[in-house]
């Protein structure tokens, strides 16, 4: 019996965007839509099994071979720098990683920067010749400049409404972010007969969504 292909998917908002894409690709999305607490859910035909994880954990499971494929944000991949193959941009979860700060505030030459993405932020400021003190935080990044923890933040922005509500403004875009299909390097080679057709079906579904 052929071993099912294991696909790691993130819980939360991205999963809601992923379901219509999976449907358009002609794949069984039923396990993704089931409202239960099982973390491993096979498809009816046994060809695939979905593993439900916290978004930050998806690349780790794929890199170490616990999952053959996964769905992960480009921001996580850039920050964590796992050894993975990225065959397809799924075109969902689009947003920006930006530098932001208080409105009408002069930024010092040696700024403190609060962020969930210390490696990306450090590389960004270093590339501009700016010596910045990077302060890792894990939640409510917008709060940091309001209470004096930092002068700037580097964070994900979708609509910008949270920044505006906290009187912060975007100063520059670090990079565009979207959701990627990722693959374990060994699986992509050894199970290419299964994975590559799946990638092409998702590619066609992604292209169709853009029309």
Swiss-Prot record:
Its main location: cytoplasm. It holds the Pfam family HisG. Keywords: Amino-acid biosynthesis, ATP-binding, Cytoplasm, Glycosyltransferase, Histidine biosynthesis, Nucleotide-binding, Transferase. GO terms for cellular component: cytoplasm. The keyword Isomerase does not apply. Pathway: Amino-acid biosynthesis; L-histidine biosynthesis; L-histidine from 5-phospho-alpha-D-ribose 1-diphosphate: step 1/9. Catalyzes the condensation of ATP and 5-phosphoribose 1-diphosphate to form N'-(5'-phosphoribosyl)-ATP (PR-ATP). Has a crucial role in the pathway because the rate of histidine biosynthesis seems to be controlled primarily by regulation of HisG enzymatic activity. This is ATP phosphoribosyltransferase. The gene is hisG.
């Amino acid at each position: 019996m052929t071993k099912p292909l294991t696909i790691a998917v993130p819980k939360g908002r991205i999963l809601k965007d992923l379901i219509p894409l999976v449907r358009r690709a002609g794949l069984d999305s039923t396990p993704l839509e089931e409202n239960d607490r099982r973390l491993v859910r096979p498809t009816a035909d046994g060809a695939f099994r979905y593993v439900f994880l916290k978004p930050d954990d998806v690349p780790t499971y794929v890199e170490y071979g616990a999952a053959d494929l996964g769905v992960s944000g480009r921001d996580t991949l850039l920050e964590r720098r796992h050894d993975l193959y990225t065959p397809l941009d799924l075109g969902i979860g689009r947003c920006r990683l930006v530098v932001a700060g208080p409105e009408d505030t002069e930024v010092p030459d040696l700024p403190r920067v609060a962020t969930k993405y210390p490696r990306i932020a450090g590389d960004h400021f270093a590339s501009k010749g700016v010596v910045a003190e990077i302060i890792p935080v894990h939640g409510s990044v917008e709060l940091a400049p309001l209470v004096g923890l930092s002068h700037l933040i580097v964070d994900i922005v979708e609509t910008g409404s949270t920044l505006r509500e906290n009187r912060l403004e975007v100063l520059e875009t670090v990079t565009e972010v979207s959701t990627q299909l990722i693959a374990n390097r060994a699986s992509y080679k050894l199970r290419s007969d299964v994975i590559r057709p799946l990638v092409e079906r998702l590619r066609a579904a992604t292209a169709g969504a853009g029309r």
